[in-house]
A protein has these predicted regions:
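A short, surface-exposed interaction/processing loop segment used at functional sites
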Residues: 138-169, 173, 270-303, 360-371
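Preferential activation on post-signal-peptide N-terminal prodomains/segments
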Residues: 22-265
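Conserved histidines in hydrophobic membrane contexts and catalytic metal-binding motifs
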Residues: 185, 277, 347-351, 367
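Low-complexity, Gly/Ser/Thr/Pro-rich intrinsically disordered linker/tail segments
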Residues: 339-359
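Short, flexible beta-strand-to-coil junctions
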Residues: 249-251, 281, 350-355
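Bacterial N-terminal signal peptides that target proteins for export
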Residues: 1-9
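Charged, low-complexity helical/coil segments in non-catalytic cytosolic or luminal regions
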Residues: 265-346
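C-terminal motif of bacterial Sec signal peptides marking the signal peptidase cleavage site
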Residues: 17-21
Length: 371
């Protein structure tokens, strides 16, 4: 598995929060109309031009520290956005029972905790070995089969164990099509009254047996306990194919950050938002739902800075870093990034440096790096 990203993150501690970037760059854009430009004349006019003609890919090597070979996943026609108060989920136990009703007959009991809070305890009539936990703001379902899949697959780039790129997304398994697996996941969220927060397209990965075995062999080398765990589940013969479906959450078409993130300067860890499902021939093996949703609007609509401004700001963050080669950006998107109280829009840049990938976020209003 990959080494820790900690050395990369520590670099950012020495960087001050940076204001809007530097000079003009000529950028090669795919699927960008000939009269559109990322070079601002007036900030508002450029913003409208850019956001209405957002490219699907950027290929640019003219920056000082950054090289862009990046897919761009940003909605068109977004010129203004709000800051929202940050709310936790509120998953009602009755809704959980309804969501599982096509698959399991559940019962629940709400119990109090020593600190004055409460949590919901569920149990199934026909599967008393399944683990179901809900604190209203977080929900987990896991049966006995799920543990190996969960340990052998990781889509969260906030962790060094990320390996989702090793799994294909375009293969149907014999027992269920990809579309049917996605529908199962979305129907579950509909029953929890989360339909309006689902961001499309959802992510789907096919956990083929061959790739799972490859990941298992690598994991056993790195973690000898994995072999003991494998034996407790019945050995390699018990490894079976499944789908992993991830459903991001969104606010008015802009996804909420779905990877784990830590504010280095304030030591504030922030969980990703969304719903994860592992679906095998026997049905749901694993479900985890958590993160944040919008509350009330915290600020009125504000102008979003242009993509070029955000790219310049990103390049500027590396001025104090000694680089042996340019940092490569492979994906650009727009996210709502949570802090302690709010959800703030930011450009997310997926960077690759020395074989490691991580997200860097630039505030979509100020052009400052979120660290």
């Amino acid at each position: 598995m990959k080494n820790s990203l900690t050395p990369l993150i520590i670099i950012f501690i020495v960087l001050c929060t940076l204001c809007l970037g530097c000079g003009d760059k000529n950028i090669e854009l795919e699927e960008l109309s000939s009269d559109a430009s990322l070079n601002p004349v007036s900030s508002h006019d450029a913003l409208v031009s850019v956001m209405q003609s957002m490219p699907s890919h950027i290929l640019e090597s003219g920056f000082e520290n950054i090289r862009f070979d990046a897919d761009v996943v940003i909605p068109d026609n977004l010129t203004q956005l709000n800051i929202w108060n940050r709310n936790l989920l509120d998953i009602k136990p009755g809704s959980v029972v309804a969501a599982f009703s096509p698959h399991l007959n559940l019962n629940f009991e709400t119990r109090s905790t020593n600190d004055g809070g409460y949590f919901d305890m569920f149990w199934a009539d026909n599967d008393n070995k399944a683990i179901i936990r809900s604190w209203r703001w977080s929900f987990v379902f896991e049966n006995e089969q799920a543990e190996l899949h969960r340990l052998l697959f990781n889509r969260d780039r906030g962790y060094s164990q990320y390996n989702a790129d090793s799994f294909l997304a375009d293969i149907d398994l014999p027992f269920l099509s990809r579309e049917e697996a996605q529908d199962m996941a979305k129907e579950f969220l509909y029953a929890l009254d989360l339909r309006s927060y689902i961001f499309e397209p959802v992510e789907l990965y096919t956990l083929s047996k061959s790739q799972l075995m490859e990941e298992l062999d690598e994991e056993i080398v790195d973690n000898p306990y994995m072999e003991t765990l494998l034996k407790s589940h019945g050995g390699k013969e018990t490894i079976h194919e499944a789908y992993f479906v991830f459903v991001p959450f969104q606010i008015n078409g802009v996804p909420i950050m779905s990877d784990t993130f830590s504010y280095v300067t304030a030591d504030i860890p922030v969980r990703g938002s969304g719903a994860s499902f592992i679906i095998s021939e026997s049905g749901f093996e694993y479900i985890e739902i958590g993160g944040y949703l919008p509350g009330d609007v915290q600020s009125p609509l504000q102008d979003v800075i242009s993509l070029e401004t955000a790219m310049n700001a990103l390049d500027k963050t590396y001025d104090l870093v000694l680089l042996s080669e340019p940092v490569v950006v492979t994906k650009i998107t727009l996210y709502y990034v949570p802090n302690a109280t709010a959800l703030t829009p930011a450009y997310g840049f997926l960077i690759n440096q020395n074989g490691f990938s991580m997200w860097v976020y630039i505030n979509a209003f100020t052009g400052e790096q979120i660290i």
